Structure formats: structure tokens, C-alpha cells
Amino acid sequence: MRNVYDIAYELANALKESNEFKRFKAAKEKIEKDEKLKQMVMDFKKKQLELEQKRLQGQEVTSSDVYSLQQLYQIISLNPDIEEYLSSEMMLAKILADISKIIAEAVDLKDEMFGLLESK
């Protein structure tokens, strides 16, 4: 029987070789080279995190909060480098979530890990 950690490293290496990861890495490097773009992305992510923290703390997230974040996204994503970064990041996050879900289902932890989220 193979060691699960060895298999996890194989999965990590496969992920690093995937087109999705390479696309994300290239987009990230482009953003990091431009201080203005980097700051725009950081400001957006900060606002996004504040909204998520508000939601997790049970505070009301108003339609105005959501609209403000959507407007900011629309503005910054007019820049093709930022749009590429955000969309490639979203795709990579989806892959990681899918992998986590596949593993949870395979070891019968789906209800424990995802059941609470689905019941809300």
C-alpha cells in the first residue's frame, strides 16, 4: 500500500504541471511586476475579505455592500491583466475545491465537511 503523503505530493506536482496552474502563475507574476495593478488587486481582495468576515460573523451584508464590491470588480477587471489573474485564480480555487470534495466523498466525509454548508 502506498503512503498517502506520497500520493498527495504526486497530486501537488500534477497540479503544478496543469495548464490552469501555469496560467495562474503567469498571471500572478505579471501582476506582481506592476505595483499599481498589485495594489488594485490587494484593495479588491481586502474589500472582498471584509465582506466575507462580516458574513461569517453573522453581521448583515447589505445589497449596498455587495453592489459596491461588484462595481469595484467591474472596474478593475477592465484591465486585461487583472481580469486574467482573477479568472485564473478562480479556476484554480475551483479545482482545489473539487479535489477536496472528491477526497471527502471517497472517504465518506462528505456530510461532515460539506453538509453544514448545504443546510444553510
From Swiss-Prot:
Superkingdom of this protein's organism: Bacteria
Pfam families documented for this protein: Com_YlbF
SUPFAM superfamilies: YheA/YmcA-like
Family label: Belongs to the UPF0342 family.
Protein name as annotated: UPF0342 protein Csac_0863
